Structure formats: structure tokens, C-alpha cells
Amino acid sequence: MTNIRKSHPLLKIINKSFIDLPAPSNITSWWNFGSLLGICLMLQILTGLFLAMHYSSDTATAFNSVTHTCRDVNYGWVLRYLHANGASMFFICLYLHVGRGIYYGSYMYTETWNIGIILLFTVMATAFMGYVLPWGQMSFWGATVITNLLSAVPYIGTNLVEWIWGGFSVDKATLTRLFAFHFLLPFIISAMVMVHLLFLHETGSNNPMGIPSNMDMIPFHPYYTIKDILGLLLMIMVLLMLVLFSPDMLGDPDNYMPANPLSTPPHIKPEWYFLFAYAILRSIPNKLGGVVALVLSILILXXXPLLHTSKQRSMAFRPLSQCLFWLLVADLLTLTWIGGQPVEHPYIIIGQLASILYFSIIIVLMPITSIVENHMLKW
């Protein structure tokens, strides 16, 4: 008699995805972040669901409803800070996951990579909308500044912005619709994650050497289930340290002031995970140019398979490309720092140079370096 997990219509899907899935025997801890992202998504949906039960999406009561959740609801503060810092963990895992994909050439699985980019955009949109909901000063002004960027679209820009606002400024209608979309999008993300996995399981996982591993596969369970649980425990530990010891470390103190359309905060800036893109946006002294650069800073990932000129897939044995990769990481950290600084000398010029370097590394330097490495290996 066949094992029920292999014969039952539902269980066999789970079996083929998480139990009997053949996986390369040499994938490292950099491959843990996919499962961690799945856990983050589930955590965000659960905490978000319970927060939504106590939230009121009206400009008059939104700020107070969040305060009420923190003060009067049993463990409401835990829910709120798990959700806020869970978003930070989500983005840390996301950026490490994408970085792993770039380093080891996982982008050569184009379908998986492309839906991953769409997922990244969707998660960023969801996080932005979530940041508006507490209706503090930074929520309101962040929403005003970022939605206003759409007015840079030629001809239809102003109409587009007013259509999104539901009026002539960020107000009650805006908050209500952003709450609706913030609630809806994670479920769409969940569906897209399934498609992401579907495409991945068509090809199987990549591995650190970037070579086919069909001759050396091991079952996902127990080897990688145990490995994923270790990663999960470490992530939960870091998250709980954040939530229980310094829940506001990554937030902005301005958001503890109720939204006031009549007073602008001294420095409007998004959450830390958007600062690199915000720095790129600000480094171009033209509104439309800045918006284009902002979108391209993520969309450029779609070109990674087209810009791959190396005869090897992974960077594991390409020291010059490795140097460029870590330069790119350092550049992104620099941009993140600049995004949180005021617009004044010397931050302006540093941001502009870092932005130029970001695009140069990806579009020009990496493909050229790969060609040089091919010649060095006489390929």
C-alpha cells in the first residue's frame, strides 16, 4: 500500500514540495532565507489580522485606535511591535535572498527571478501602505510625499494623484483605501509566492557552485527541514530581542505625534528599508528623473539575466566579480545612510556618486569584469 502522503491529492502536493523534494546536497545557509520569508509572511498576516480587529481606518480615530491597541488590548503592544519589526525582518530576509540570487547566479532561472521581482515590488507597496495606517506625522507626510511623486507622470500626473487620494489632499478617503489594500495585498502575495515556488520546482534549486546537481540530490526532509528550523530559531530570537528590548529602534519618533497637515516634520524620511531607494530618488534634481531612477533601482534586477556575460553561473570562483559584488553591497549601505540624512552638503554629492556607482556596477562594470574573467581563464 502506498504511503498516504504520496497518494492523497492534497498531501502529495505538500510531499513533493517540502518532504520528498530532491535538493542539492551542498546548498548553504544562504538558501535558508526563502523559508524564513514564508514564515515572515505568515507572521505578518496573523499579527496583521489581529491588529485589524482593533484598528479604525478613520482619520479621527486611527491614531487613537493604535494607542488603544497598545495600552488596553491584552498583549496588543506585542502584536503591534511584532508586526512593525516583523516587517523589518521581512526586508532583511528579502534583501539577503535577492543578494544570494545575484551572487550565485540564481537569476538564470528567469521565470522564478521575474516573479520574485514582482513580489519585491508588491511587498514594498504593502509595507509603504502599512506605514501610513498609524496616522502619525511621518505616516501622513510620507504618504503625501510618495503619492505626490506620481504627479511627475506627464499629462495625467495631477489627475492620477487626486484619483489615488480620493480628494485634493491625503485625507480620510486615502487612509480608508490604503487600509483596504494593505489588508488585501498580503493574500495576493501569498498566491504569488506559490507561483514563485511552482517555477522554482520546475528547475530545482541552484547551488553555490552554479553547476547542475542532478547526480547528487538529497531529500528536503529531514536535512533541510532541520536546517530551516535552525535559521527560524535564530530569526525569531533576533525579532524577539527587537520587540521586547528596543521595539522603537527602527521606527521614527515623529510617528508618535498625531498627523497634522499644518506642520511639516523637519526631515521626512521613510522606514530604513526604503532609504536606499529614497536616496536614489533625491539624488536627481528633477522630479520625473528621480521617479524614473527610483523605479529603475529595483526594475534593474530584471536585466540581471541579460547582463550575465560570464561562462560561469556562480561568483564562487570569480574573485573580480566578488569584489564588485561587495562594492555594490557597500554602496547600498552608503545609500541607506544617505537616505536618512538631511539634504545638505556633503550628503548631496555623496548620494549622487553612490547612485551613479550603483547603476554603473550593475549595468557596466559587472558584465565587463565577467568578460575579463572569461579571457583570464582562456574561455
Curated annotation (Swiss-Prot):
- Taken from the record, one Pfam family name reads Cytochrom_B_C
Q: How does it sit in the membrane?
A: Multi-pass membrane protein
Note whether Acyltransferase occurs among the keywords: no
Transmembrane region positions? 33-53, 77-98, 113-133, 178-198, 226-246, 288-308, 320-340, 347-367
Residues annotated to bind heme b b562: H83, H182
Q: Where in the cell is it found?
A: Mitochondrion inner membrane
Could you tell me which PROSITE patterns the record lists for this protein? CYTB_CTER (PS51003), CYTB_NTER (PS51002)
Protein known as: Cytochrome b
Q: Gene name, please?
A: MT-CYB
